[in-house]
Amino acid sequence: MAVNFKFSLLTITIVVNILVYCNASAIKFDVDLEKVPSNAVACPAAEDIAPCTCKVGEGDVMDMDCSKVTSDAELASIFSKTFPSNTFRELFIEFNREITTLTADSLGAATFTKIAITSCTQLKTIEENAFMASAATLEKLVLLKNDLSSFPFEEMSQYTKLNWLELSVNSITGWPALSSDTLANLILFRNPIGNIPVDAFQTLPNIEQFNCFDCSITEVEAGTFTRSPKLQKLVLGYNGLTSLPVGAIKLHGHGPTTSNLGITNNQIISFPEGAVEGIQGILGIDFNRVTSLSEEVWRPILENLFQFSLLNNPLACVCDVMWLIDSPELLAKIKGNPRCAGGKRLKNLDPAVFHAMCQ
């Protein structure tokens, strides 16, 4: 009986240990299963999208690069296929000489938060609805260094998250019919746009930055850049401006780096009092034809500025600059040491000479 009892006890112990081990293994197995996400992002099969490529980035987001597509038809064919998911983060196409037109079928049902199509020198037309599948997701659209002459600006009001629109270095002519409640950054430099209508920004209530460097602008009407309550950065360099009227520009910055105005490389001779207001960051007027720095115009501006750049202007440096020479804290805000028309440097002028000559 004793032997049987010991045998039974041993049997019970073994069974219990097996059950405990199995249960523990089951628990461990369950925990491991929980570590496997049920909705893991998967790129389309490489053979289905070639020569496009797809990669999954941090945060389970997919980026698509279609720089090597060989035709408009091939791009549309790739995006006509069924993907595991149509939700992408970025579409990138660069240095492609085969794409000429993007149509409503080019990107199929795929959606993106950013689209960057750059240096595609044969791309001339973006047709209506080309990006419409991304109307609810697109935040940044960059179409840089192509040859675009046609773009559906009038559709941008339907893009409910669009913050950044850039079509720099293209062939856009005339001011676009653009309306958006979300757009904060509009970058159009190096397009032959011409003069900007005085009411151009009334349909862009949240615009913060506008860049139209080298846009064939010859005139800015009073009020053009004063009705945008959030405008902080304005670039109008390398145009044909010869003057600015009173009330032309008013920026709305909130610190020394938030409101900047660049109007370099124009033909501006003078600035009337009240032509520019609200600049707290950097004001650049290099390579113009400014001759005078009268106190009534420039003291209010300089007192609020972080930095003032006015290199390569034919400054007369006569009695009109005495107030500036006598204000070292304002003189220090001037970038570098501009040369006067007579050859002397502005910051090297002798205050004693001006006091004797001008008082």
Curated annotation (Swiss-Prot):
Q: Which InterPro entries match?
A: LRR_dom_sf, Wnt_signaling_inhibitor
Q: Does the keyword Transferase apply?
A: no
Q: Which UniProt keywords apply?
A: Leucine-rich repeat, Repeat, Secreted, Signal
Q: Where is the signal peptide?
A: 1-39
User: What superkingdom does the record give?
Assistant: Eukaryota
Q: Could you tell me where this protein is found in the cell?
A: Secreted
Main localisation: secreted
Quote the cellular component terms of the Gene Ontology held in the record: extracellular region; membrane
Q: Where are the LRR repeats?
A: 135-158, 160-180, 181-203, 228-251, 255-278, 280-300, 302-325, 331-356
- Function noted in UniProt: Non-catalytic subunit of oplophorus-luciferin 2-monooxygenase. May stabilize the active conformation of the catalytic subunit.
Q: What else is known?
A: The shrimp has luminous glands at the base of its antennae and legs, and ejects a cloud of brightly luminescent secretion from the base of its antennae upon stimulation.
What does the record note on quaternary structure?
Heterotetramer of a catalytic 19 kDa and a non-catalytic 35 kDa subunit.
Instruction: List the protein's name.
Output: Oplophorus-luciferin 2-monooxygenase non-catalytic subunit
